[in-house]
From Swiss-Prot:
GO terms for cellular component: membrane; nitrate reductase complex; periplasmic space. One of its GO terms (molecular function) is molybdenum ion binding. It is an enzyme of class 1 (oxidoreductase). InterPro entries: Asp_de-COase-like_dom_sf, CT_Nitrate-R-NapA-like, MoPterin_dinucl-bd_dom, Mopterin_OxRdtase, Mopterin_OxRdtase_4Fe-4S_dom, MopterinOxRdtase_cofactor_BS, Periplasm_NO3_reductase_lsu, Prok_molybdopt-oxidoreductase. It comes from Cupriavidus necator (strain ATCC 17699 / DSM 428 / KCTC 22496 / NCIMB 10442 / H16 / Stanier 337). It catalyses: 2 Fe(II)-[cytochrome] + nitrate + 2 H(+) = 2 Fe(III)-[cytochrome] + nitrite + H2O. This is Periplasmic nitrate reductase. One of its GO terms (biological process) is nitrate assimilation. Substrate binds at W797. SMART domains: Molybdop_Fe4S4 (SM00926). NCBIfam families: NAPA (TIGR01706), PRK13532.1 (NF010055), TAT_signal_seq (TIGR01409). PROSITE patterns: 4FE4S_MOW_BIS_MGD (PS51669), MOLYBDOPTERIN_PROK_1 (PS00551), TAT (PS51318). The keyword Electron transport applies. The lineage of its organism: Bacteria, Pseudomonadati, Pseudomonadota, Betaproteobacteria, Burkholderiales. Keywords: 4Fe-4S, Electron transport, Iron, Iron-sulfur, Metal-binding, Molybdenum, Nitrate assimilation, Oxidoreductase, Periplasm, Plasmid, Signal, Transport. The gene is napA.
């Protein structure tokens, strides 16, 4: 039998993907392996600790230690598969440098910011924290305290943190590291649909006819979902895969259409497709007339830089970047008509034929399209626009909220959706899509939390980028970091990150399991419990909430972030944090601590210890004398029930392999906004985008605008940063797994061979990557998995010995306030 080279690549793609993903045993064998009678191990379910896919795993415990993990064959998400990172979950908690005692900078037996780290007791640690926070609150008020949290917080950790800051300290200066990864997606959902998170689910992978990847390397970042794309492509020959990126990566092995485009010009291509749909009379007029409205957004909105930056000073609409006016369909058609094939092809460097092939997939009414994106769209100075504009394509054609027709924002962290977004740990949000700027939303939160009216501030707090700037400027002085490594992850860290941590006026606390770059820059380091060392809940990218029990104890004196938050609340009486006029509205709170008001309020503490499953430990329940996790969850769930964010009762999640909200009458929802699938859609409406008052989604007219920084003669290369399969985020867990470390020990500079040759460089040569902000040393790689075009270099950011974010620019999308890590100008200098 003859087989072409292309067919050979197609057929081997699934094998290669399975190889890098790490396919586990067939279900029957897997069940045998996890049979406690055979293995003499106790096996329990849990979601994976890594990305937002939400794979289910089974965890084996022996002698109070995790000794094995494998893909859960009963999990709908991954059906028994694991990626290579998931295979080594059992090792992430057992690095040799695991933190087991609090560490504080000391000199002569006392705290000193310029001292060396020394072990202290928890009482000593909290004593100093208490002193510093009370000092700052007294001197400057609640705007001078803050917290940087995480999409890796469990649901109840994020909820407890939001309560402590927004209600207890009365400060909205709490933000998650999801600001770096999912803020543009969230803002895009809210602007278009009035509600956050995808309307579809992973079932769409088995129903789509075409997959279009906009800036997403799923083969490495979401490998289990990529196996589903691969399976669909190879099982159904008419299925098409389109991969758009600024450089070639592993997804291109499966692509029917591979498109390399100039950075930022995805905006122009999106408008071209909308124009193509209209010009070729492929608009679903019935759907558009019934279910959409058109708006034109303001332009020239700046780049989220400091106010004195020339680009910010020149921007005409930086003060209100999200403003928009209603327009007609004809006005929208005229707006996108400027984006014709000649203009867009020249701007993007994409051949016209490929643009038309891509556009036809969206335009053809018989092709079900799944659009998929991650950081390529979200880490973008116009990231919110990019999200809005891809929804335009699905709304114009009516290809939305039905099986296989799905604009799908993939998530990078295990609970960026479930905790950062749904719980509302962003500086402007409250639970269930409510916001601090809305008086009715604040009133509802205060009612549920039993707070006096006016407790929650009405202005958004400092977002992630602004927190670093305010630390540097001395306006944010008491700061707590949990479950993230922002000194490695934040852009422009030498100019805007590290100075704030070392500012003598500031006291920085970092809770972590390992001595990360961020921990080493702190004043106090608190040892945290990890993953199954505590009871937890995550919410994944398809709205699936998943629970797990505590399976082992944390080592030494390590404590969960939840325990740390709630225990610290005992240190503050309301008189020390609230003004007298506020307490006068609730005089019964006089003399009580924030712990009493927030966590022993008759709601959070109403579930007794006997409700805890006797088969499992629960360190927090034991410490506080009630089922803390259940109480927090049930109080939190009150926000969403009856409002389109319905969560099932707490105990149901310990039985199920996750449930996709809204969960109404015990039934999960796979497709939102569609009649017959979503219980909130009224009979006879067909579709209802009920997040907006009129029940309609918004189609936005938005232009192409250039990036904040582009290559020039002095800095001739684009720099793109990102991740690799073997490591997750900053590598603080994966680099401590020997097998993963050996597979990709250090970051490299992926570069086109001709660019390297022109500079007199060869593979393996040491170079410096230099920008206007800083420099970083690495080695050139001209082969391998990633192949940049000429004029662009790609550098992963997992390597703590190569801090590429010394170089990046802290420009953001002015609407979402998410950083653009994908576009800045650099030069490459031989060492």
């Amino acid at each position: 039998m003859k087989i072409s080279r292309r067919d050979f690549i197609k057929q081997t793609a699934i094998t290669a993907t399975a190889s890098v993903a790490g396919v586990t045993l067939p279900a029957g064998a897997a069940n045998f392996v996890t049979d406690s009678e055979v293995t003499k191990l106790k096996w329990s379910k849990a979601p994976c600790r890594f990305c937002g896919t939400g794979c289910g795993v089974t965890v084996a415990v022996k002698d109070n230690k995790v000794v094995a993990t494998q893909g859960d064959p009963q999990a709908e998400v991954n059906k028994g598969l694991n990626c290579v990172k998931g295979y080594f979950l059992s090792k992430i908690m057992y690095g040799q440098d695991r933190l087991t005692r609090p560490l504080m900078r000391m000199k002569n037996g006392k705290y000193d910011k310029n001292g060396d780290f020394a072990p202290v007791t928890w009482d000593q640690a909290f004593d100093e924290m208490e002193r510093q926070f009370k000092r700052v609150l007294k001197e400057k008020g609640p705007t001078a305290v803050g917290m940087f949290g995480s999409g890796q917080w469990t649901v109840w950790e994020g909820y407890a943190a939001a309560k402590l800051y927004k209600a207890g300290f009365r400060s909205n200066n709490i933000d998650p590291n999801a600001r770096h990864c999912m803020a543009s997606a969230a803002a895009g959902f809210m602007r278009t649909f009035g509600m956050d998170e995808p309307m579809g689910c992973y079932d769409d992978f088995e129903a789509a006819d075409a997959f279009v990847l906009w800036g997403s390397n799923m083969a490495e970042m979401h490998p289990i979902l990529w196996t589903r794309v691969t399976d669909r492509r190879l099982s159904h020959p008419k299925t098409r895969v389109v991969v758009l990126s600024t450089f070639t990566h592993r997804c291109f092995d499966l692509a029917d259409i591979g498109i390399i485009f100039k950075p930022q010009t995805d905006l122009a291509m999106l408008n071209y497709i909308a124009n193509y749909i209209i010009r070729n009379n492929k608009v679903n007029k019935d759907f558009v007339n019934k279910h959409t409205v058109f708006k034109e957004g303001v332009t020239d909105i700046g780049y989220g830089l400091r106010p004195d930056h020339p680009l910010q000073k020149a921007a005409k609409n930086a003060s209100d970047p999200g403003a928009a006016k209603v327009i007609t369909f004809d006005e929208f058609a005229k707006f996108v008509s400027k984006y014709d094939a000649d203009y867009v092809s020249k701007l993007s460097a994409v051949p016209k034929a490929k643009l038309d092939q891509l556009a036809e997939l969206y335009a053809d009414p018989n092709i079900k399209v799944m659009s998929l994106w991650t950081m390529g769209f979200n880490q973008h100075t116009r990231g919110t626009w990019a999200n809005n504009m891809v929804y335009n394509l699905h709304l114009l054609t009516g290809k939305i909220a039905t099986p296989g027709n799905s604009p799908f924002s993939l998530t990078g962290q295990p609970s960026a959706c479930g905790t950062a977004r749904e719980v509302g740990t962003f500086s402007h949000r409250l639970p269930a899509d409510m916001v601090v700027t809305n008086p009715k939303h604040r009133e509802e939160a205060e009612r549920i939390w039993k707070l006096p009216p006016g407790t929650i501030p009405d202005k958004p707090g400092y977002d992630a980028v602004l927190q670093n700037r305010m630390l540097k400027d001395g306006k944010l002085n008491a700061y707590w970091v949990q479950v993230n490594n922002n000194m490695q992850a934040a852009a422009n860290l030498m100019e805007e990150g590290l100075p704030g941590y070392r500012n003598p006026a500031n006291f920085i606390v970092v809770s972590d399991a390992y001595p990360t770059v961020t921990a080493l820059a702190a004043d106090l380091v608190l040892p945290s419990a990890m993953w199954v060392e505590k009871e937890g809940a995550y919410g994944n990218a398809e709205r699936r909430t998943q629970f797990w029990h505590q399976l082992v104890d944390a080592p030494g004196e390590a404590r969960s972030d939840l325990w740390q938050l709630v225990e610290f609340a005992k240190r503050f009486k309301v008189e020390e944090v609230w003004p007298p006029e506020l307490i006068a509205k609730k005089p019964e709170y006089k003399g009580k601590t924030l712990y009493d008001v927030l966590y022993r309020n008759g709601q959070v503490d109403k579930f007794p210890l006997k409700d805890v499953n006797a088969e499992y430990h629960n360190a927090e329940a034991k410490a506080f004398g009630f089922y803390l996790q259940k109480g927090l969850f049930e109080e939190y769930a009150t926000f969403g029930r009856g409002h389109g964010h319905d969560l099932a009762p707490f105990d149901a999640y310990h039985e199920a392999r996750g449930l996709r909200w809204p969960v109404v009458n015990g039934k999960e929802t796979r497709w939102r906004y569609r009649e017959g699938s979503d219980p909130y859609v009224k009979a006879g409406t067909g579709f209802q985008f009920y997040g907006n008052p009129d029940g309609k989604a918004v189609i936005f007219a938005l232009p192409y605008e250039p990036p904040a920084e582009s290559p020039d003669k002095e800095y001739p290369y684009w720099l793109v940063t990102g991740r690799v399969l073997e490591h997750w985020h900053s590598g603080s867990m994966t680099r401590r797994v020997p097998e993963l470390y050996r597979s990709f020990p250090n970051a490299v500079v992926f570069m086109h061979p001709e660019d390297a040759k022109a500079l007199g460089l060869r593979r393996g040569v040491e170079v410096e990557v230099v920008s206007r902000r800083g420099r970083m040393r690495s080695r050139i790689e001209t082969r391998g998995r990633d192949a940049p075009p000429r004029g662009l270099v790609f550098v992963p950011w997992f390597d703590a010995s190569q801090l590429i974010n010394k170089v990046t620019l802290d420009a953001t999308c002015p609407i979402s306030l998410q950083t653009d890590f994908k576009k800045c100008a650099v030069k490459i200098v031989k060492v």
